[in-house]
Amino acid sequence: MCLLRLSALGDVTHVVPLVRTLQAAWPPVRLAWVIGKGEHRLLDGLAGVDFIEYDKRSGIAGMRGVRRELGGQRFDALLQMQVAARANLLSAFIPARRRIGYDRSRSKDGHGLFINERIPDRPGIHVLDAIGSFCEPLGLKQDTVRWDLPVPAEAFDWARAQWPDDGRRTMLVSPCSSHVLRNWRPERHAALADHAVDAGWRVVLCGGRTALERETADAILAAMKHPALDLVGKDTLKQLPALLARGELLVTPDSGPMHIANAMGTKVLGLHAASNPARSGPYSDRRYCVDRYDAAARRFRGKSADTLKWGAKIEHEGVMDLVTVEDAVAAFERYRRDHG
């Protein structure tokens, strides 16, 4: 069986419970997974899975390379879990008898031309549950959600070495998503972080190595009254899950780290206005999310969120300004009330 999901970090994290469901039902099954480069680094070592890496920059030549790497094998089933045009075209280079794709409401970019079966059309569900339903045409049901991400012991050792075990509670801040319009203002992050420090918490900034992430972290640090530990750009994708597991609470917009933290059992204070947390928020627990999606729909679309197509993004300039510092502080205090 072959899985096709190239990106992004959060979405491939959502695929892992499906892998666990397939493996639990059919223990001998060997899965091939065509995946993106960075996403492969995150999930490398996932037991029972043979990864075939596809570089999005490689175009048709890279697609031919995937076919060569598959060695001429024809799969009983291809689970085509990405509807973007590039992924649809890539799927044509993967020989398979059953080609299972998304329902019509989630399809786009000619997705239906590359598949011969569809998952059930179930509106109003989380992205993880939609991905989990890819096992249903195979006669299975994803009743249990289990991740167990492949994190090496050295990654946990690295995370433990970043700050002392002194009993101080730790709030992680991962301020950047893959789309700049989902990001919250640095000065608002700083205000929430200062509130946490005033409450006795340690604040740790984390993120990748892009210029935007560095600039955002610097702006947060400059606006804070208190010091914070700056780990932005200092971890690897293998160390990231261990780092997120070490924190007690993660503050982040809709982002890959949100879903990785959730998979590692860390609670998330999600900042939502551009996207619907019921669809793409932290899967296990959304009690500490700020949800201004309906306010965004009314402001920028002139209608309530429940009248929009499920999954509609409201990525407009200024949309995240609907999330106030007071909203985030209230969510933080909600967490403190529930967890002592």
Model-derived features: where do they sit?
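Catalytic machinery of carbohydrate-active enzymes
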Residues: 1-340
